[in-house]
Every structure is written in C-alpha cells, then in structure tokens.
Amino acid sequence: MKITILTIGKRHEPWVEPGIKRFLERLRAPFAAEMIIIPHSGQIGDRARQDESERLMSRLKPHDFIILLDERGRNLSSPELSRLILDHTDQHIVIIIGGAYGVTETLHRRADIVWSLSRLVFPHQL
C-alpha cells in the first residue's frame, strides 16, 4: 500500500525538514510513503483555489482513496484512523492539504473522507 501526502505550499523551513523526514520514515515501515509539494499558484482568492485544486486533482487516479484535510471535516480518533487506513490497504491513499484559500467544491466532493485535525487552521509546517 502507498500513502501520498499531496500539499500546496513551498519547501519547508530548515528546522521542519528533520521532523517531516522522521514522520515519513516511520510511515515507510508498513507503507510506501511520499510527500509531494505543489507550489502555490501565485494567484489570490478564488483564482488561487481553482488553480491549486485543478493541479491537485491532476495528480489523482480514479481509484485513489482521498483523505482531504479540512477544518470542517470529521474528527477521527486514532483507532478510527487506523481502521480507515486498514480498510483501504488495497488502494493508494492520498492525503490532501490545500492551500491558504482552501479547495474547490469539486475537490471536496472527490474526497472519500474529509478529516479535521482541529477546527483551527494551522500553518503547513505543523
């Protein structure tokens, strides 16, 4: 099984890189894992949301299991997240983190689950 973290953003601050590397190494023990950073669009508002969502969606395959991170999503406990992942080990799991302006409704509907880590919005480094 493969897990891809697909995010809009830029290269992380040097102090963040070791944490991301360690997290991906821990994921790689049971899974093939990667992080793909797609650059910000350079637009603002709705234009940025549309452009970035299109670029995110262009990376998706029809049978990918999509988890979209969004503050309006469901809160999951660790056992619930574990069960969700185990139930989809036969699929490529893609975790999407949108840009500052969020994602389009089209991408929202494409997600198999919308997951909220918190009702707060955090910088990508976290």
Residue ranges and their predicted role:
Residues M1-L126:
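Post-transcriptional modification and biogenesis factors for structured RNAs
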